[in-house]
Structures are given as C-alpha cells and as structure tokens.
From Swiss-Prot:
Molecular function GO labels: ATP binding; ATP hydrolysis activity; DNA binding; excinuclease ABC activity; zinc ion binding
Any one GO CC term of the record: excinuclease repair complex
Membrane-crossing segments per the record: none
Record-given protein name: UvrABC system protein A
Length: 948
C-alpha cells in the first residue's frame, strides 16, 4: 500500500516556478535553501495557506466574517492536506499583560491551585485567616466611630455580564427596596436597563444604620440576612469612608483584615478582582527618572544640567530656575553633583509651600509677572505628562520617564489580598518569579496535606506536564513572569511549540519557521527530540530551517534554489538527507557532506591595547561582570540561551554607548563604569527590525541610491526642457507622483467585516507616477522601470555611474542581488532587512572609529549566505572598525578574532564570564559548552583540510 503523502502541483506563489512535489505525511520534513529562494513561499504561502483556507471555508458565513477572507494561493492543486497550524516568529504578543505563564496557560492552572488549596494569611500579623462569625463581624462594625452612618449590603452579583432582570425582579418580590448597582444606589423599581455585554456588580441594601450603643441585636439580624442572601459575603458601605468587606470564610481576628471567597479570578492580574489597584495589574508605573532629567551630573545648571528645562522659545522655566536659585542661594555655576543634598532636593522635588515671584518673557513678546509655589522639576514633568491635553507635550515629557516597579505590589501585579494566600510556603507572586526549571522542581516536590494533595493532584499534573514541555525545548532559564514582548522570535516560537505538544493533537500539519533560532548547540538535541515526539503522535511537520543538526535529523529534506529571488523557486533536490548530500547540484548537500564549507581563517587579528572596558555589569542576570571588548577586530559573544549575552551587549554596551555618543535617551542596564568610549565616534545597531513601516520605504530609498538615481533623471535633456527638478521623480511629494494613489501604486478598499483589499491603482497602473513624469527616460527606461529592476540588473544598467554602481554593488555583496529596488520594506524578511542596513553602512566612508553591533545576524541565512555575510563583516573590520556579534552559529564563532563566552548556564545559573580569547583558547576551556562544540568543528575542519 502506498504511503500517504501531500501532493503539490503547479505552485507559483512569489518566485516559485510551477513546482510539483510530493511530501510524505507523518514525517519530519525540512525545507532549506538560500535566503529568498522560495522556502517560505512553498511552506507558508502555499501549503499552510491552502490548509488554513480550506478549514476556514468549512465554517459558517457568520464565523468567517470574524476570521477574514483568505485568498487561494497561486497553486493548481494540493492533495492530502491535513488541518494546518503555523508556528512562526511573527506572532509574539507585545501586550504588557502577556507573560510566559499566561501564554502557556500554566498561570490558569496555578490560579486554580491557589483558589482550591490556598491558605490566606493576614499581611499585618502573619497568622492564618480563619472564617468569621456573625459576632466577630458585629464587634468589628461597632468599633467604627459613634454616629457613623452605614449601609449593610449583600453582594449577589460580583462583576458578571448580563442584564440580570430576573434576579432584580426576585429581589423586589422579597421586599427589598434599594440596590447598589456598579456603585450607584437605585430604587428596585427604578433600575435602568443594564448592558448585557458589560460586567456589573449588584448589591442588595439590607439595612441602613447609625453606629451607636444598643444596635447590636438589629445589626446581628441584618448581617445574618445579608449573609444568607449572598452566600456568606457582606459589604459594609461606610458613608464618607471606605467599604468594609466581611466573609463567613476568612478574616484576621486581630486587625479584621478579611478576604473574600478564594476563586481563580482573584489571582488574575487581568481582572479587577485580582489586579493591584495602583498599577492595574501591569506591575510597573511610568515614573519620572532623575537620571534622564539630569543625564550629566558634571554639568552646571547654567550649562543645562536639567535637560527638560534647557531654554527654548519661551524662557519661563529657565527664569523660574534662576529665581529659585537666587532665593535658596544655589550656585548655578557649580556641577550638579557637587550641590548639597538639600539643594538638589529643592530643585528636583520643590520648595514646599513657599511662594516665589518672578518675571518672564512670553513667546509672543512682552513680560509677565507670576507668583507661584515651586513644585520641583520631577513633579512638574509628572503633572505635565498626566494632565496636558497636548500630545506633543506628553511625548516630550515621556522622554524623561521610565517604567519602574509599582510601589504597592513591588512588581508582582496583584492585590494585597491575592498576595496574602500561600500554597507550599509561597504566594503566587513569588512562584511566578521562579524560572521554568525552578518551578518544575518546586511543583514536583511540593509539600501538601493529604486532603490538599487529593484536591490538587489533577491540577499539579497539568502544571508539571506543561513545565516539562517548556524545559524540553530549551527554555528552562525563562521566568514564568517574563513579559512576552521581551522574548526573542525563537523563544516565542518554542513556547508555542511546547503549548502544541501539550495539546497532544494528532493528524495535524505543523509548519514551523526556524525553531532553532537563539538556541545553543547544547540544547539542539532536545528541540529535535521534541519535533520527533510531535511527529510520532501522528503529525506531519514541515520545518523551514538552516541548522545542520535539524537537517541531518530530517526524514525528508527539500532543497529549494538554486539561487535566490528570480534565480530560485525550483526544487534542486529532495529525499533523505543522505540522498541530498550525494546530489552535486544541491548547494545544501555540498555543505552538509563537507565538500563545501566556511574556512577557518588562516590567521586571526590580535587583540590590541585599544579596548572598551566594562566594569561591574549587573543588568538582568549579569553578576557584576568585568569584561574588555577589543577594538578594530571581530568579537563574538557566545553562551547558552539565557546566559546574559543580550544583557551585556544590547542593554549595557549598546545603550551606554548610544547614551554617550548619540545622546540617546535610552537607559542602559546597570554597570559601575565603562572606559574607552572616547576612541569611538559612531555606534550602529544592525538588527532585524524592518527598514521602514510603510510600503513607501524600499531598499533604494533606505540606502540613499534613489536620490542619486533621481539626480540622473533630473539631468536628462527631456527633464531640463520640461523644467523638472529632482523632486519631480519622488513618489512621496506632489508634482511627479500619481495623485490618485498618492504615489503608493495601490489603492486600499475597506471591506468592513472582511479584510481590507489592496488593488493596483487604475490611473497609473501601479507605477506610482503620473504620465508626464514617466515620459522622461534614461537609456530607454523611465523611473518606474528602474524601481522594478532587480539590484543585479540595476548594477549593470548604471555601470557607467560610479556613485550609483558603488551603492548597488554593496547590496549585491550582501547577497541581495535578487531584490527589486522598489520592493516594499514591509515584504522583506528580518534577515533581508538586516543586510540592507549592512549594505547602507558599507558604502559610507569609514573613520575607523565605528562599532557595529549585530544580534544573531545568521537568522534566516543559509550557510552560503553566512559565508557572504562574513566577507562583508570582515570588510568593515579591515577598515579599522569594530564588530561585536551575539551568535550561536559555529561557522561564525570559528571565524571570530576574539570570543567572550558567558554562562555557564542560563537564567540565574548564568551571568558570569566562562572564558575569553581566540576560538582555539575557548575550545580548550573544559567548563565552556561553546568550547566543547567548537573543538569538534575545528578538529573536523582540520581533518577535512588534511584529507584534501
């Protein structure tokens, strides 16, 4: 019987050239090939898109309107498709409320655990809270000041959706006259219609009393009635005071601290029932940061030490500052750090109630006298940020503010009540501060009573199972409260992978995009085993991947190419990894078999005395690290995932240099001092973020070559006759562009319930320019024709214009010859965007004082692309510049001049320097995981060289 398979016929998405391919089902299939060869076009834009479209088509029209219309991919037929799930890197939630624990649903089970077996403790007296009797409630109320007016309320609905008409009617029938609905007292016969889609709180007014001697009996009767109505809950509305909450279940006998019935939503920071009231469950508050207000404490007040009050068009604040200094005898020519603590406090936090009189010049001319209390710079910024109606003012003030942990919950996000409940000696805020490996160990060994163990058994099983999956995909160093928005693409993808394994689905087609990104070689085996486990459940996995180990572990390998863009889009080779390795046409096969490889450099540039010295780096998990980064060579920072590489390079090195060199407002991670910055004049962070957020940005505009091309068109005879200047050939301004589409070339049609549809502009035919502009040609081509050329074609077309050719050649050098000059920035992959940025740096004149920082530049790159990238990076170093790279890829690590290896483990087990030196030095360091794998690679390369 024939093995089941997925049969694709006539795939033409993007650059695919009418591909026919048969893929075995229930196998681990890896698709590889050069960057831009068409891997994602086949895996995501054809196979996954059709699987998803067919599933959506099977739903009702009502459901489809919320999911959106899915276009049919450009393919003739696909047979044997299963329901498809895509696990890519673009769907990371940036919501500040989303954490590792919430995304993986572990937090839901932890909340349930605390609600079922949690023990509440009084935060004031640290004693377990027991249930309250009616007598205890009476005694507590009688402690209120005499003549205090109170209302006894029975909460019958607590923050639930619905119109609740039947309930209100029943309350009226029982003889109750008043209700408190969402904080407002209303007559039971006069209740407005409640919005059924909103949450409401309804409390019955059981009695209204004035606190005085002799009311105890009536009070006790009314409390019993209220408790009966609301299943053991009581709210006392103290007129002109705060509500008191009582429960038959929990309250402190000493101070009366009481807590409602334990339920899961009480432990949710996304619910008003559980969230900290100060920060609304975010754990952080935007607070004025004195270090941003006074960035350089060596400056005097006259030199502009207080940055937000540096003179602008109005001299209001400078005049006020001068007057304050006169009144309090503060020397304005003394460095800020040498002022007394009292003087600094007056400037920053105000002068109390003392009024100050001063005269200032108004913007429109003329002077004005003011008498006011000096509030201080910090309260002034805070007030203007929170109260100003001007968006511009709020934006300006926010530059001097930082997210700091909330003072009430200390960053734990939850209310005081929620944090008073303990399981196994920890509250829920403490548990989520654990890393995944620590949490797994804690829950496996948790100590519960026999009764609690019986209740918690099933919940613990779910928690342990999910933590185990996360541990198995190499994420043991992540803390449960880590914000999703701070995860790398690879981490977010592996979290989704672990969640999918937890669902234990079978018969599904999973399409993954480079799951090994950001993963150290040490953890690769665990990831591959996870993929095999998913396959063994009866699923088909299509993985777009360049990782050597993953390709070798595949059941079926597909090499797409042979080149990129127009030169790709074909199946070069497919079959088992062994079959592909024997195929001489397959570039991937040649690298896998060792016939081709990235060579170890014949010599390494020695580290000179010129260096950046970082002392006492303590950002995130760094443990007071001291490290030197040599200048004018290529340094690679290595270490297992979570060891502190990004903390050292991005948080400390980059942000501190950006602050000093670029006068950036970013706040670097903690460190004691950094020396050697004066040897640099430029810092460039070449990351994988888009080169532009709109379709108007493209490689030609980003690299600046489009300016030169427009100059060429403005110099043509036709342009001179017509009086066209350079601006005529821009699609961003009026004049030469098509006004029907405003130079976009496409028109957006809003479809309301369906997704917006983009269609080519009928007036300009998608060419972006008006007819008159397109009549101007250079060598037979108009400006729109130029934008449609690939970089390679344009390089030949402009070969006689050195200025243009030089810039275009840098794009070819970084492997982007296949990209069109006008390709929308939004359609470039992260790796392509990064290489466009590199190209734009390559054609600039070097001073030899620049430092380039790259974070995993090999993401999305084939070995052949990496070889090209390394040549480009070495060109930068040959100019005398410095390159610092965070990388796991051994081909990059082995070609480094100098390595800084962090670790030894991830998370709390990392944050120290394991070894520094050349790759050969690291390979001899037994305590280095990187060294272990590097040694194997260096020995294998040496062996291959000798064999030749």
């Amino acid at each position: 019987m024939k093995e089941p398979s997925i049969v694709v016929k006539g795939a033409r998405a993007h650059n695919l050239k009418d591909i026919d391919i048969e893929l075995p089902k229930n196998k681990l299939i890896v698709m590889t090939g050069l960057s831009g060869s068409g891997k994602s076009s086949l895996a995501f834009d054809t196979i996954y898109a059709e699987g998803q479209r067919r599933y959506v088509e099977s739903l009702s029209a009502y459901a489809r309107q919320f999911l959106g219309q899915m276009d049919k991919p450009d393919v003739d037929t696909i047979e044997g498709l299963s329901p498809a799930i895509s696990i890519d890197q673009k769907t990371t939630s940036k919501n500040p409320r989303s954490t590792v624990a919430t995304v993986t649903e572990i937090y839901d089970y932890i909340r349930l655990l605390y609600a079922r077996v949690g023990k509440p403790y009084c935060p004031n007296h640290n004693i377990e809270i027991e249930s309250q009797t009616v007598q205890q409630m009476v005694d507590r109320i009688m402690e209120l000041e005499a003549r205090t007016k109170i209302q006894l309320l029975a909460p019958v609905i607590a923050h639930r959706k619905g119109s609740h008409e039947k309930l209100i009617e029943d309350i009226g029938k029982k003889g109750y006259v008043r209700l408190r609905i969402d904080g407002e007292i209303v007559d039971v016969n006069d209740v407005p219609t409640l919005d059924k889609n909103k949450n409401h709180t309804i409390e019955v007014v059981v009695d209204r009393l004035v606190v005085k001697d002799g009311i105890e009996t009536r009070l006790a009767d009314s409390i019993e009635t209220a408790l009966e109505l609301s299943e053991g809950q009581l709210t006392v509305d103290v007129i002109d005071g705060e509500d008191l909450k009582f429960s038959e279940s929990h309250a402190c006998p000493i101070c009366g601290f009481s807590i409602g019935e334990l339920e899961p939503r009480m432990f949710s920071f996304n619910s008003p029932f559980g969230a900290c009231p100060t920060c609304d469950g975010l754990g952080q508050k935007l607070t004025v940061d004195v270090d941003l207000v006074v960035p350089d404490k060596d400056k005097t007040l006259n030199e502009g030490a207080i940055e937000p009050w540096i003179p602008t068009s109005s001299d209001f604040y400078p005049t006020l500052l001068k007057r304050v200094c006169e009144v309090y005898k503060i020397n304005m020519d003394k460095p800020f750090k040498k002022l007394t603590e009292r003087q600094r406090d007056i400037l920053l936090y105000g002068s109390g109630d003392k009024e100050i009189e001063f005269t200032f010049t108004q913007r429109q001319g003329g002077t004005r006298k003011r008498t006011m209390v000096f509030e201080g710079v910090v309260p002034n910024i805070s007030r203007r940020f929170h109260e100003s109606p001007s968006e511009y003012t709020r934006e300006m003030m926010s530059k001097y503010m930082t997210e700091l942990p909330c003072e009430t919950c200390h960053g734990k996000r939850l209310s005081r009540e929620a944090l008073s409940v303990y399981v196994g000696g920890l509250n829920i805020g403490e548990v989520v501060e654990y890393s995944i490996s620590q949490a797994l160990n804690y829950y496996k060994n948790i100590n519960l009573s026999e009764q609690d163990q019986a209740i918690a058994n099933q919940i613990l099983k779910e928690i342990i199972s999910r933590l185990t999956f996360l541990n198995n995909v190499g994420l043991e160093y992540l803390t449960l409260n880590r914000a999703s928005g701070t995860l790398s693409g690879g981490e977010a993808q592996r979290i989704r992978l672990a969640t999918q394994i937890g669902s234990r689905l079978t018969g599904v087609l999973y399409v993954l995009d480079e799951p090994s990104i950001g993963l150290h070689q040490r953890d690769n085996d665990r990831l591959i085993n996870t993929l095999k486990e998913m396959r063994d459940l009866g699923n088909t996995l299509i993985v777009v991947e360049h990782d050597d180990d993953t390709m070798r572990a595949a059941d079926y390998l597909v090499d797409i190419g042979p080149g990129a863009g127009e030169h790709g889009g074909q199946i070069v080779s497919s079959g088992t990894p062994q079959k592909v390795m024997k195929d001489k046409k397959s570039l991937t096969g040649q690298y896998l078999s060792g016939k081709k490889r990235i060579e170890v450099p014949e010599y390494r540039r020695p580290a000179s005395d010129r260096k950046i010295s970082i002392r006492g780096a303590r950002s995130n998990n760094l443990k007071g690290v001291d490290v030197d980064i040599p200048l004018s060579i290529m340094t690679v920072v290595t270490g297992v995932s979570g060891s502190g590489k990004s903390s050292l390079v991005n948080e400390v090195l980059y942000k501190s240099l950006a602050q000093k060199i670029n006068k950036s407002k970013v706040k670097p991670g903690l460190y004691d001092k950094i020396e050697g910055i004066d040897q640099l004049d430029k810092i460039i962070d070449i990351d994988q973020s888009p080169i532009g957020r709109t379709p108007r940005s493209n490689p030609a505009t980003y690299t600046g070559v489009f300016d030169d091309i427009r100059d060429v068109f403005a110099q043509t005879n036709e342009a001179k006759i017509r009086g066209y200047q350079k601006g005529r050939f821009s699609f961003n301004v009026k004049g030469g562009r098509c006004e029907a589409c405003k130079g976009d070339g496409i028109i957006k049609i809003e479809m309301h319930f369906l997704p917006d549809v983009y269609v080519p502009c009928e007036v300009c035919d998608g060419k972006r320019y008006n007819r008159e502009t397109l009549e101007v040609t250079y060598k037979g081509k108009n400006i729109a024709d130029i934008l449609e050329m690939t970089v390679e074609e344009a390089t030949q077309f402009f070969e006689n214009i050195p200025k243009i050719k030089r810039k275009l050649q840098t794009l070819v050098d970084v492997g982007l010859g296949y990209v069109t000059l006008g390709q929308q920035a939004t359609t470039l992959s992260g790796g392509e965007a990064q290489r466009v940025k590199l190209a734009s740096e390559l054609h600039k004149r070097s001073t030899g004082k620049s430092i380039y920082i790259l974070d995993e530049p090999t993401t999305g790159l084939h070995v052949d692309d990496i070889s090209r990238l390394l040549k480009v990076l070495n060109r930068l170093v040959e100019n005398g510049d410095t390159v610092v790279i965070i990388e796991h890829n051994l081909d990059v690590i082995k070609t480094a001049d100098y390595i800084i290896d962090l670790g030894p483990e991830g998370g709390s087990g990392g944050g120290t320097i394991v070894a520094t030196g050349t790759p050969e030095d690291i390979a001899q360091t037994k305590s280095s995981y990187t060294g272990k794998y590097l040694k194997e690679v260096l020995e294998r390369d040496k062996q291959n060289t000798e064999d030749k």
